[in-house]
Amino acid sequence: IGGVIIMGDRGTGKSTTIRAITDILPKIEVVKEDPFNSHPTDFDLMSEEVRKKIENGETVETIQKKVSMIDLPLGATEDRVCGTIDIEKALTEGVKAFEPGLLAKANRGILYVDEVNLLDDHLVDILLDSAASGWNTVEREGISIRHPARFVLVGSGNPEEGELRPQLLDRFGMHSEIRTVRDPELRVQIVEQRSSFDKNPQECLKEHKEEQENFKQRIVTAQKLLPDISLDYDLRVKISQVCGELDVDGLRGDIVTNRAAKAYAAYNNKNEVSVEDI
């Protein structure tokens, strides 16, 4: 779908909600001890080293692990984001000595940028390149290393603190806005839940464990259903008609709405997209 951006007031739980996502996502299969979270069978999601092993008929050991949630700090350097090549080692030992960056760790996971509207322009450009191609290329002194960087981009921020660059905003498939709760009873409920968690975190987690497991199972079922979800031609035309009337630039709006509607239908355990899903 292309990630999600959550904008809203300070102290409304944006970061807390986003960081909790990994607890409800099913585990993924990755190649053991691989810094890029390589997929064991999909060539578009594996490093060159793993691909060569598979092409040579070697077996690769795999493990199940939680989906990675990688934070991209606002002041991060280009080397920290993209990774670095040890030139001295490469020249003296003849090996590609690569120290993976945040993009490598985020492959097949979630890359989270808090206060995304304050991100430096040079980091925005790096994100745009990786988000568009799904690959990260690092070149130093004639040495080039390329690895998969297919991640879900998630951003949050307060719109009052600055505007988001249109090019980056265009990379987020979905947008959510959070406002401060005004209803006194609901505010009390939130404060009480927070107090109870602070007193006994383990007990609070245990209380919601069953509900969370059901939620996780619902996502697993939806993932299996998704490839077979059908979207009627007339509804596809309606989506494009609405996007046209809203003067949406390009075709990303059409594509995202089609994909999101299918995902929502799968989440609701349906085989066909309805108007309500759209």
What is the predicted role of each segment?
Residues 1-185:
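Conserved ASCE/P-loop NTPase catalytic core
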Residues 2, 136, 196, 271-273:
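Conserved hydrophobic residue
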Residues 16, 20, 80, 126, ...:
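Alpha-helical scaffold segments in soluble metabolic enzymes
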Residues 26, 132, 177, 196, ...:
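Generic secondary-structure signature for well-ordered alpha-helical cores
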Residues 80-82, 164-222:
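Conserved AAA+ ATPase core "coupling" helix
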Residues 160-161, 165-167, 181-189, 217, ...:
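P-loop NTPase catalytic core
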Residues 228-229, 234, 239-278:
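C-terminal helical "lid" subdomain and adjoining coupling/linker elements of P-loop NTPases
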